[in-house]
Amino acid sequence: MSKRCAITGKGPMVGNNVSHANNKTKRRFLPNLRTIRVTLEDGTTRRIKVAASTLRTMKKQSN
């Protein structure tokens, strides 16, 4: 399964866990993906994974 937004293409970022002793280990920052249903032009519905930030932007632009 791809951890990528279907609309914006946002995906995982790479960074570090940093302990109090300043030890660093690799980690991934994953996007906050939500599964939504989208109705296409031909009337069929499809489930797509969308980042929560994208959903917020879509909601703001629809009003």
From Swiss-Prot:
Residue ranges, annotated region (Disordered): 1-20
GO cellular component terms attached to this protein's record: ribonucleoprotein complex; ribosome
InterPro entries: Bacterial_rp_bL28 (IPR050096), Ribosomal_bL28 (IPR026569), Ribosomal_bL28/bL31-like_sf (IPR034704), Ribosomal_bL28_bact-type (IPR001383), Ribosomal_bL28_sf (IPR037147)
GO biological process: translation
Gene3D superfamilies, alphabetized: 2.20.150.30, Ribosomal protein L28/L24
Alphabetical list of SUPFAM superfamilies matching this protein: L28p-like
UniProt GO MF annotations: structural constituent of ribosome
Keywords annotated in UniProt: Ribonucleoprotein, Ribosomal protein
HAMAP family per UniProt: Ribosomal_bL28
Family: Belongs to the bacterial ribosomal protein bL28 family.
Protein name listed in UniProt: Large ribosomal subunit protein bL28
Gene: rpmB
